[in-house]
Structures are given as structure tokens and as C-alpha cells.
Amino acid sequence: MPIGTPSVPYRLPGSQYERWVDIYTRLGVERILFLGQEVNDGIANSLVAQMLYLDSDDNSKPIYLYINSPGGSVTAGLAIYDTIKYVKSDVVTICVGLAASMGAFLLAAGTKGKRVALPHSRIMIHQPLGGTSQRQASDIEIEAKEILRIKDMLNMSMADMTGQSFEKIEKDTDRDYFLSAEEAKNYGLIDRVITHPSEANQS
């Protein structure tokens, strides 16, 4: 039987009454966001809006982005990536479970020194996926060129975020490349492996 989104009690500031809200709304009040599904335009728009709001509300406090995602749309993921870089708030990225493909890219995009993973997390990087249907040869050629352009852009960004060379990133992402949390730290995708919430925001 499917499990619905849990609700938890929440008392608005200044109110003596509690109301029930979904758990993600409650976590958002604490500046905790969760990417727990495939990256698509809907989830990207939601996360972008939440980050912009939290940043405008108080950019002196960090935003915590928990990631357990198989990846997904490159364009949707880049919208989240650009917003992480755009906001003034530090963005603490935390891998729980799996950060694969665009999920790994967003994990590495967090504020340097504040990219972390739990001990049994898995991280996977690879080149962007692309496919063609029955279309004109000229359209297929255009799409192929765009995929290669995006691949180079992602690899350059990943090299910058990890400290690895462009050539190593290009070689490692030619196929699915899985890393443990400790291996991801050594690779430069994250800064620390943590076991307690208090460790997440340490530089």
C-alpha cells in the first residue's frame, strides 16, 4: 500500500493553535529542502522557488538540501544548480541514499566545505544521456551537437567543483562511475562524510 506524504503538527509563531502540515512544508520552515525523486521541471521549479524565498528571508543562514535522487533532466538540474550559485545563502548539500547523475552534480554544487554525505551513501557520475527518434538527419545532427556541448559544459563544471582534471572527468564519466561516500570525498565530490547533523554545517 503506497505511503502518502506524512503530516506533522506545526504552531505558527504567535499562535496558540497547532495545525497539521505536510512534513516537507515543516522542514522548509527550518530551511531544510529535500530532493528525493527524479529531477524534472516540476521539482526544479519548486526547489528554485523555495531557495529564492529562504535566501530573501535571511541570507545569513544556510539552506540545507538533502539529496536522494537518481538524476533526471539536465535542463531542470541546471536550473537548480544555477540557483544554488545565485543565492547568497550557503547551500549545504547532503547525500542520503543515492546521488546519481544530475543528483551527484547538484551534490557537488553545494558551498565548498559544506558538501557532505552519510556513511552508506552512493554517488554515481556519468555523461548526459540522449536519444533520437525517427527524425530528419539534420535534426539528429543538431541534437547530437547539443548533447556534446552539454557534456563538455558539465565536465568543465564538475572539474571545477572537484579539483579533478577535465580529462579525468571525461574518462570517468564515459560509463557509470560509482563511488562510496569515502571515495566521493577523496574524489572531491563532497568534503566530508558525517554521522551527526551538527557536522553538516561545519567548514
From Swiss-Prot:
Keyword Protease: yes
Known function: Cleaves peptides in various proteins in a process that requires ATP hydrolysis. Has a chymotrypsin-like activity. Plays a major role in the degradation of misfolded proteins.
Record-listed E.C. numbers: 3.4.21.92
Catalytic residues of the enzyme: S101, H126
UniProt KW keywords: Cytoplasm, Hydrolase, Protease, Serine protease
Catalysed reactions, as listed in the record: Hydrolysis of proteins to small peptides in the presence of ATP and magnesium. alpha-casein is the usual test substrate. In the absence of ATP, only oligopeptides shorter than five residues are hydrolyzed (such as succinyl-Leu-Tyr-|-NHMec, and Leu-Tyr-Leu-|-Tyr-Trp, in which cleavage of the -Tyr-|-Leu- and -Tyr-|-Trp bonds also occurs)
Major enzyme class: hydrolase
UniProt xrefs under HAMAP family: ClpP
Pfam family, one: CLP_protease
Naturally occurring in which organism (per UniProt): Prochlorococcus marinus (strain MIT 9312)
InterPro entries (alphabetical): ClpP, ClpP/crotonase-like_dom_sf, ClpP/TepA, ClpP_His_AS, ClpP_Ser_AS
Localisation: Cytoplasm
GO CC terms: cytoplasm; endopeptidase Clp complex
Gene assigned in the entry: clpP2
Protein name per its UniProtKB record: ATP-dependent Clp protease proteolytic subunit 2
